[in-house]
């Protein structure tokens, strides 16, 4: 018999995470490595686990993730978004809990582009009065 799986795609900055939830004991595997190997920061790992702790499903699913693009923070945000969407597919009753915590909303903040005539997005060259 085929195993039950729930899918969710999460995005943040320039990172994209494809998340699969499989019934298990709570392991999180990112790009075929344990989460602590891929993301060294404990704060980011807590951030990733937030949807599971809010819905009290922390020990019921194994989370298998493929993530690419961006840096560690962007990837963590993408994984969190993907887990929230996959949990929603698993049980639609989680919608209110996840929505209230803001986990279903795609964070649209992106890096602002550098403008010509400026040193950065907003940083102007030094001004000299004389």
From Swiss-Prot:
- One GO MF term attached to the UniProt entry: RNA binding
Single Gene Ontology BP term?
Answer: translation
To which protein family does this belong? Answer: Belongs to the universal ribosomal protein uS9 family.
What residue range is the signal peptide? none
Q: Which is a Gene Ontology cellular component entry for this protein?
A: cytosolic small ribosomal subunit
Q: Which PANTHER family match?
A: RIBOSOMAL PROTEIN S9, SMALL RIBOSOMAL SUBUNIT PROTEIN US9M
Q: Which InterPro entries match?
A: Ribosomal_Su5_D2-typ_SF (IPR020568), Ribosomal_uS9 (IPR000754), Ribosomal_uS9_bac/plastid (IPR023035), Ribosomal_uS9_CS (IPR020574), Ribsml_uS5_D2-typ_fold_subgr (IPR014721)
Could you tell me the gene encoding this protein?
Answer: rpsI
Organism lineage reads as: Bacteria, Bacillati, Bacillota, Bacilli, Bacillales
Q: Which keywords belong to this entry? A: Ribonucleoprotein, Ribosomal protein
Q: What is this protein called?
A: Small ribosomal subunit protein uS9
* Binding partners and assembly: Part of the 30S ribosomal subunit.
NCBIfam families documented for this protein:
PRK00132.1
């Amino acid at each position: 018999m085929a195993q039950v799986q729930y899918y969710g795609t999460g995005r943040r900055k320039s990172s994209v995470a494809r998340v699969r939830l499989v019934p298990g004991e709570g392991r999180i595997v990112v790009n075929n490595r344990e989460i602590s190997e891929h993301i060294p920061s404990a704060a980011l790992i807590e951030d990733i686990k937030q949807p599971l702790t809010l819905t009290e499903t922390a020990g019921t699913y194994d989370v298998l993730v493929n993530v690419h693009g961006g840096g560690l923070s962007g990837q963590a945000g993408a994984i969190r978004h993907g887990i929230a969407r996959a949990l929603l597919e698993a049980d639609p009753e989680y919608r209110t809990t996840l929505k209230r915590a803001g986990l279903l909303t795609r964070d649209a903040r992106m890096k602002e582009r550098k403008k010509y005539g400026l040193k950065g997005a907003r940083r102007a060259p030094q001004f000299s009065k004389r």
